[in-house]
Every structure is written in C-alpha cells, then in structure tokens.
Swiss-Prot record:
UniProt-listed PANTHER family: ACTIN
Family: Belongs to the actin family.
Gene: arp9
SMART domains (UniProt xref): ACTIN
Disordered: annotated segments: 56-92, 319-339
Biased composition (Basic and acidic residues): 56-72, 319-336
Subcellular location field: Cytoplasm; Nucleus
Species annotation: Schizosaccharomyces pombe (strain 972 / ATCC 24843)
Protein name: SWI/SNF and RSC complexes subunit arp9
Taxonomic superkingdom: Eukaryota
Record-level GO BP terms: chromatin remodeling; regulation of transcription by RNA polymerase II; transcription initiation-coupled chromatin remodeling
GO cellular component labels: actin cytoskeleton; chromatin; cytosol; nucleus; RSC-type complex; SWI/SNF complex
Disulfide cysteine pairs (residue numbers): none
Amino acid sequence: MPSFRDDHIIVIQTGSLYHRATFGLAESLEPPTIRVRTRVGKNDNGEYVFTNKEDINMEDPNVKTDETKVETSESTSEQPSNSNVTEEKNMGSSFHSECKVDDFTPLPNEIQPIQRGRVVDWEALKAFWKHLYSLLLKDPNDTTFRYPVCLVIPTYWSLYDRELATQFFFEECQVPGFTIAYEPLMGLYAIGILHGLVIDIGYEKTDITPILDGQIIFTATQQLPLGGRYMTQHLQNLLRESLPTLKSSGQYVSKEDITELFAEQVKCSEIAQVVRDEQDTAKDPVKALTSTNNVEEEDPAEDIGKIIASGQTRAYLAQKEREKNGESEKDEKPDNTDVEFQTIAIEPLGDCIVGRERFKICEPIFHRPSNETVSLPEAIYITIKNYAANYKRRNDLWENIIVLGCGSRIRGFRECLIQQLQFKYQLSGSLEPYYAAQGTDSILGMTTMPPTPYPALINPCKILPDYFPSWKPDAGTNAMFEELAFLGGSIVAKTSFNESVSSHYVTLEEYAQHGPTAIHTKQ
C-alpha cells in the first residue's frame, strides 16, 4: 500500500465553537492554518449559508498577529511617585481583545450543529464540513489528487456518529484514506507521554479524561457543564453590577450594552487574569519560589526542582537576566494585578474602563457554583479517587495534569488550578496527613476504609519537546498551548498515513468492502 505525501494530508479538529484544520503537513508540524466558527445558517430558500471568507481566521501560521499590544504612551517623562497619577497613566494605554467579533455576528436562522461536544444536527454538520473542505482545497472539484483526512473528535462520540463521519468523507469528499483520533489522547501524544489526566476546557463544557499506558479509561471520564461560555456569562453579570465607564464621555455603559459579546471581548484580552489566592504560600511552588528569591542572601542554594515545578522557568530566567544586567524594576510597567482599572477597546462602543471584575472570571470554575454540580478541583479529585485507577497508579495522573481547550486561555488559569489542587489535596503540611492517617476524607467529610491516599505531588505537565519549534511561546506564530490536541492529531496523521500497511486508517478499498463500520477496526 503506497504511503501518502505529507503535503497532501488534511487534519481537522472538531469543536462546539471552532473547527481547526490544516492542509498539508510540514516537516516540523505547525499550528492550524484555518479556524472556522462551527455554525451554519439557512436562507429563505432553505439553503445553507456560511460565514464569509473574509471573516475566517486564515492568517499565515508563521506570522503572529499582535492584537494585545499596548499602545505606546505619549509621555516618556520620569514616572511620578504619586500612585493615582501612575494609575491614570496606565489607564491611558488601551488594550485590544483577541475576540473575533465578526464570528459572533448571527447568521440567518443560525444552527450550531455541535453543542457541548456532541453532534445535534448531522445534516447541518455535513454541510459545514463540505464548506470547510472547500476552503482547505484550492479546487475541490479537481479529481487529479485525493487527500486523506484525520478527524480529531471527543471520546464520547457514539459508534453511529463515527460511522456517519466515515461515510461522509468517503462518499462526499472521495478521500482515499480516513482515520479518527481522540482529543485527550492527542494531547498526550503532543507532549510525548503515555499517562496523565487531560482537562479540556471547552466552550460549553469541561471534559476530564484519565489516560494510563496510552489507553483512555472511558468509564472514568467526566463532563462538567462548565466552560468558557459559563465564565463569560458570569463576567457579564459582574459587569452589570459594577458598570464599566466609557473613556470618551466618562459615563457608565448601560446594562443593555453589556452583552455577552461585550464580556467575551473583555475575557479574550490581556486585562483578564486569574488572581490566585494568597492562602498557604508554602504549598504553592510559585509563591514559594518568590519567597525563596526574597531571602536569597540567606540561602544561596537555589532549588532547581522547585523552579521547574512552578512552571515559571522562563520568567525566572528573564528576571535573573535583568538582575544580572542591573536593570531596575522601577522602569518596568506595573503588573496588571496592581492596577485597579484598565482600558480596553470594545466594539462598537470604543474604549471602556473596566475594574477588578476582570479578575473574577473563573470563580464559578474553581468554587462550587451550585448544589447541582461540583467545582473543577472537586471533579478532578473524585475522578482520580473513585474511578480512574487503583491507588498504585493514581500518582501517574496527579503528576501529569494537562490543561487544554481555549476556555482555559485566560492568563493564570493553569497556575490557579494547580494551586487549588495542591492546597486542597496535596499531602503536605499538618492537616492532610491527619486525615490520611485517620482514614477520613477531608473534602467529603466521611470516614473511608481503607484510608484515602492523598498525592504527595501534584504537577502540571506542560513541557513541549524541542522538535516542535513552531509551537513554542516565543516562536512568533499563532500557536496556542490550548490547541495541543491538534498537534497530536497531526503527529498521528503523519505517522499513520505514511505506513506501508493501512493498520491505523481505512482505505477506499476497505470502505467499499466493509462500509462505515470499518472505522471501528482501526482504533
């Protein structure tokens, strides 16, 4: 069986809010070249209509659009000592949102074919896929070449859903090869490990998936009805309680103008940030690292392991470089958390001044929003403790926590989540050993037998291999760490479609012989 050329391979990742896709894989795998809002509309004639081509994010993946750059201040004079004057000066710099406003402009009779990760309208989704396929190819009607497709999907798509997807791409797109990959497993493949706990923060849901030895534990997967949109709606309510101010007129923004799109633009900007609690500093590796720096003269030996575990290695090295060069911190801009108000450009209102509500976006995620559901840290604990594995393998999950999904793209989200887990569940200090010794669950408040084992170490797994330079934070591309599942799908597509035998994908001959059910034999 001849292999396919890398520049002929198509990778598509499904999503409730956006589809991500690329046509052709480079030698060094790159971020998706196209991101399309997952929606279709219907005109008066009953025909499907789609987003205009100009509204689709089709920038060159090797060029990063700096949409969150702060405007240069007109004044270059020495910074005044008065804190109020400093704050006014910082407010004069307007931030910009990464939110694509055109993507939220409603279509006529708009349909969202995928909701909470599940397909709710197959006819609309097929029409959308056909539109997406035509965007990827310059001439979809050209029969000279046919291109294999790797489709990255959630773990909970049913067998029937996978069969319908297989049938569509073979019969409608005439692909010569087709395979399906699971999103959480692709996140592990991208990093290069075989076990871990994958947390995917989506648009309307959060998926928690434990993986051991490269195998998904399907019986232990959980889904919470909390996602990026839930955080946006929470921010919208906060802004309506404490109204932002229009910079041009000095008047409050009316409640009617504080729409979900208004809150989405604030959330998708640099002024939005998760501020971690200042509780139990000793258990927080980042804060412990900071406190260690303050007493560096007393203890010159630096804890390298603590620096790496904090996830702030780059920032730490940059700080050391500045100290080495004798640069003063007084010349640096104040931290976002130290500024009471920030100015952001909101379409179509203009510059608006937003207060500290921008720090409370993730409150319903980290703290139980209601009695009907649990918080994200509680769900993670319950997943590992009750379902995922026996106590001998639980540390493999606690020590490899991966946070994916663009719902987690708010600055400080990962660090805050790890801090919450460490504060509540990590076996350190005086409280947790007592509960562990007594056989009492400190969270659920009940006696357990045998004693509940608490992890001795909770770590995020966020180190990318060096052979993916386009995905590095300083690579100057539009890569997002939250899209690592797409990178893993590209890895699987590159290796699967280059095999001499079709052991991991369905060929056109196999489809003609066995039909759509052939996809179940390739996973």
